[in-house]
Amino acid sequence: MPPLMRLTAITLDCADPQALAAFYARATGFEAHPGSDTDFAGLTREDGLFLGFQRVDGYRAPQWPDPSLPQQSHLDFTVDDLDEAETVLLELGAGRPEYQPGGDRWRVLTDPAGHPFCLTLV
């Protein structure tokens, strides 16, 4: 049976769509969508996957792993070298929560809007 659905887009809530899109563009190499503006910005991968960022008034960033402000979304990215990727992403504006449950297998970081994401080895 062929798949019923095909993932074409992922959209994250945030306070500043353009700033969050800039972070992910530098981190992933996705291309900025020409229709991006201050309320909704997007990035497109070569195969068409769209990553969107929408402005939400009163946005409250997740405080992972605090369940009172849950993670709201979760992205996983594979990398060749955890330490190198973490260093570059921190320079780009990512954060590193104190709680790290993955040991040497994965790292949890947060984007500039507070969304947690994981880096895992290829």
PLM features per residue range, with description:
Residues 43-47, 109-112, 121-122:
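Active-site beta-strand termini and strand-to-loop segments that position acidic
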